[in-house]
Amino acid sequence: MYVLFEGVDGVGKSTQIEMIARAHEDSLVTKEPGGTKIGQKLREILLGGDFKLSARAEILLFLADRAEHYQKMIKPNSSRLILSDRGFVSGVAYALANDASLKIDDLLWLNSFALEGKFADKIVFFEASETLIKKRLSSRGLIDAIEARGLKYLLKVQECMKEVLKAHKFNVLYIDASEDIATINAKIENFIKF
């Protein structure tokens, strides 16, 4: 089962992925961007801030990573529980936040192409208030190029993520990121039962 953990930075995705992975020893933990060797290089380019890419070039690099990630990580491990920190929802949402002229349907088609039509089996979406995001990001210290765009930008991305999830009949568990870790974990465990 291919499960995406989606939400902006600082909402608790990584914490929950670690907990779920410990409870499911045969699970595969991966991430986008950066889940493959080429993905790690693309991640450096995309998040490092060394290059000023156009919005469309950025989308295409994320799609290249997504296609490679699907071929090397998701497809060959389809019989396992795959826990991915981000995926196509983030890709589409960040693209929409960067360029309002883009259409969700076009971006979903491009992602479907990259994923051979295989979107995630289940999606866990973490939503957080402005106050919570600000608090958690300020406690982390280092900021990547996307986080550096600001809190308002991350809130815009979060709204775009919700639009993406509503645009298609995805199997989604909505999580209030302000809930305690154990409560969130129990909800996710129940959601991903085989």
From Swiss-Prot:
PANTHER family: THYMIDYLATE KINASE, UMP-CMP KINASE 2, MITOCHONDRIAL. Its EC number is 2.7.4.9. Pfam families: Thymidylate_kin. The keyword GTP-binding does not apply. Phosphorylation of dTMP to form dTDP in both de novo and salvage pathways of dTTP synthesis. GO terms for molecular function: ATP binding; dTMP kinase activity. InterPro entries: P-loop_NTPase (IPR027417), Thymidylate_kin-like_dom (IPR039430), Thymidylate_kinase (IPR018094). ATP binds at residues 7-14. GO terms for cellular component: cytosol. The keyword Transcription does not apply. This is Thymidylate kinase. Keywords: ATP-binding, Kinase, Nucleotide biosynthesis, Nucleotide-binding, Transferase. The gene is tmk. It catalyses: dTMP + ATP = dTDP + ADP. One of its GO terms (biological process) is dTTP biosynthetic process. Belongs to the thymidylate kinase family. Gene3D superfamilies: P-loop containing nucleotide triphosphate hydrolases. SUPFAM superfamilies: P-loop containing nucleoside triphosphate hydrolases.
